[in-house]
């Protein structure tokens, strides 16, 4: 036996340690790309499902500006159809592969940017794969769940197929490029749920990804950090607002800033109070047409929401929705999502889109009316005080939204300025530190101040389990 192999065994024996415990665990430093396409799943969920015992970070900005020196795996789950992988990205990927890094690209036949990317390496996504799927490599063991599109390989001999469909067409394959490994597969072979509840194929994804990353040395002692919303490529100061965006989204930044600044006065008028100090003071642009978020100070806005910039009505509703989430803090609303969109519809109307705004309000209420024509049987959670069956799933969601819109419309019919009066009263009465909770009882108490009449009997009549004696906010006589 060679000395370099014998020495660890001798040391282990002398120290009384099992030699197997001396084997170094392969280390993976994974970077998941959010710059080309933002999804809540890509923001930490992929890592949680498939590399939970390894280090993982995200890149919210341009890929070519990310420091990959201490990374050995790059995960590209998708690219918004409005964007593409630019030449600087391809140069970065080629250099990373040449240095031994692993790159995972998932996609489908309909993903034009992903197809264009893998086309640079001799691959494209084809038609739907046929089940059952089968492993073609020892790394893949156990059941193969999910689905997706097959791969068309221009030089099959350059690739190693890991999974094939019933017709022996490749579904997951890898090839060596430089010292690195390119791994291409059907998007449906991995999870996608924002709550990370669908960790399909986790048993074999981990060894496959670890093997792909094995060609590049990393140092666990050195820093390995991601680039988040606060570290995008560009920062623009516009009054109290800080706008951040990546190189990819630079062509859309001017339009996004303009519509946000144009909408703010209308939002503030509807809310009745200015934003609290620091709230919604930072905006980051997201490469997506669906989904944003608010953390109070920071707001993430989907640049392509509602076919923006071709149309502005849905974008007005969306950015108002996210802004309202910051406006209502520190106490979220009992109808937190619906009221944010409802105010968004009112702002849409104020900004010249009256017909579309009222149509959306009407449609939302009608979805609840189809479940309960009286709109008096259920509360916001689909629970009935009168013995009607509890609502579940989609019906509960339709009731939550429709009932909230209906209540707010009933109040607005009595006082067109009710939203502004309500939020002014809430700002005065719901003080941080003085209030432990802001529930339905507190909500009705604040509405009483805004409307100047007792609303507890009416809310009980329409299905809310509220009691004036349980309100954490004093109820006016």
Positions of the model-derived regions?
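Zinc-dependent metallopeptidase catalytic helix centered on the HExxH motif
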Residues: 302-370
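Bacterial N-terminal signal peptides
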Residues: 4-16
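Active-site-proximal alpha-helical
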Residues: 267, 339, 347, 369-467
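An acidic, glycine-rich "communication" segment
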Residues: 23-27, 43-44, 106-180, 221-225
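Extracellular ligand-binding/catalytic regions of CAZymes and related secreted enzymes
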Residues: 22-30, 35-49, 69-70, 95, ...
